[in-house]
């Protein structure tokens, strides 16, 4: 059985991968996340997911066979990528832009072994209710939005802003479990392994 490495420091991605019963080792694979000139949001998230998987592969010292899973999520409003907020003003500005509107969340996953790399991009639409400036400031003060694309976490306190979701909840959190299980299956890594081991 191939060993799996998750090239991510995200605790949410670790939780989601654990949820589907796939044993893995998490590794940190930092790459430059600056968008390229004229790069579409879809191309951006796919490039970053592949880049993280490739960076992870360079870190791994295990003998083959193994696979590396990389992922990236972008919040997109009117074609513009909203990254992780740099400070309170940035986070509040993002939330005010998202307030009362529908936005797109793109999550890309990439799996590679020594021979090939396959990727998928999952698109979800999230609709926010109206948010007051006071709510945005209080949310920032909670600490939750600091490391989140678009300045919010759907799985935490930020859920109160979400009026609707069309797509994959787990993809908005950071790892689309259905597509991840399918893609890992193509590489001979089945889900529910930890259930069979008990």
From Swiss-Prot:
EC number(s): the record gives 3.6.1.9
**Biological process (GO) annotations?**
nucleotide metabolic process
Query: Where is it localised?
Result: Cytoplasm
Alphabetic keyword roster: Cytoplasm, Hydrolase, Nucleotide metabolism
Q: Which SUPFAM superfamilies match?
A: ITPase-like
Please give the coiled-coil regions recorded for this protein. Answer: none
Looking at the UniProt record, the site noted as Important for substrate specificity sits at: 12, 73, 155
Top-level taxon in the UniProt lineage: Bacteria
Cellular component per GO, a single term:
cytoplasm
* Record-level Gene Ontology MF annotations: dTTP diphosphatase activity; UTP diphosphatase activity
User: What does the record give as the function of this protein?
Assistant: Nucleoside triphosphate pyrophosphatase that hydrolyzes dTTP and UTP. May have a dual role in cell division arrest and in preventing the incorporation of modified nucleotides into cellular nucleic acids.
Full protein name: dTTP/UTP pyrophosphatase
**Taxonomically, what lineage is the organism?**
Bacteria, Pseudomonadati, Pseudomonadota, Gammaproteobacteria, Pseudomonadales
